[in-house]
Design a protein with these regions (language model features):
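Bacterial N-terminal signal peptides
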Residues: 9-20
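Hydrophobic alpha-helical segments
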Residues: 23-214
Length: 214
């Protein structure tokens, strides 16, 4: 009986996890205002405007997307931007793998903006189209290179098990090295935060652009 209960709980947990992944981040209901009206440079406190100007220079969505939410807390936004500057532009991970890690979280969270913004960057950086499309379809990507497979496996084990096995750790360290492995987990966790901020604000791709996850 005890074994049955444990198996039932395990199966239920898996089912609930799959159900949760079926929900996409959704826009406001028709006629409803945005949770966070789009902020402008002029609306920022004077001491936060230099930060806003920096964001506009590097962001594909200007002050939109996660920045529209983050800037409600300017000190946090400043710290987060500095972290993102490292994880986007100065990380030890090759861009192909870094963007792959980001869209894995975009898929798991079904984050419309995260996928919209980073899918083309992943392809541009050399991630095979089939790998990205298989990921979006919800299947283990086929024909991954060894380093891509490690990024996928580490990301998914962390998501599903909240840890990785000793065997995967040793494999990942052998392929990526210690610094890249740490940077991989850091970028993955940071983009969970980004996905949550986007969900909080119900931020969507620019008007007229199709939703990646209908």
């Amino acid at each position: 009986m005890k074994t049955f209960i444990i198996r039932f709980i395990h199966i239920t947990a898996i089912f609930l996890g799959l159900v949760s992944l079926a929900f996409s981040q959704t826009p406001p209901a028709p006629g409803e205002p945005k949770r966070f009206p789009q902020i402008t440079l002029e609306q920022l406190p004077p001491d936060a405007r230099p930060l806003g100007e920096e964001i506009i220079k590097i962001s594909s969505v200007g002050l939109g997307g996660p920045y529209n939410v983050m800037l409600r807390s300017p000190v946090f936004a400043d710290r987060m931007k500095r972290l993102l500057d490292y994880l986007r532009f100065n990380t030890s991970l090759p861009t192909r793998l870094n963007e792959f890690a980001i869209i894995i979280q975009g898929k798991v969270w079904r984050s419309q903006v995260e996928w919209y913004a980073h899918y083309p960057l992943a392809i541009k950086a050399g991630l095979p189209q089939q790998v990205a499309d298989d990921l979006k379809a919800g299947i283990r990507p086929r024909d991954m290179k060894p380093d891509e497979a490690v990024v996928y496996d580490v990301s998914m084990e962390m998501i599903n098990n909240h840890q990785i096995s000793d065997a995967l750790f040793q494999k990942a360290k052998a392929i990526l090295g210690e610094q890249q492995l740490v940077d991989l987990v850091a970028v993955s966790g940071t983009y969970v935060t980004v996905a949550m901020l986007l969900a909080l604000g119900q931020e969507m791709p620019p008007a007229g652009k199709p939703l990646p996850f209908p």
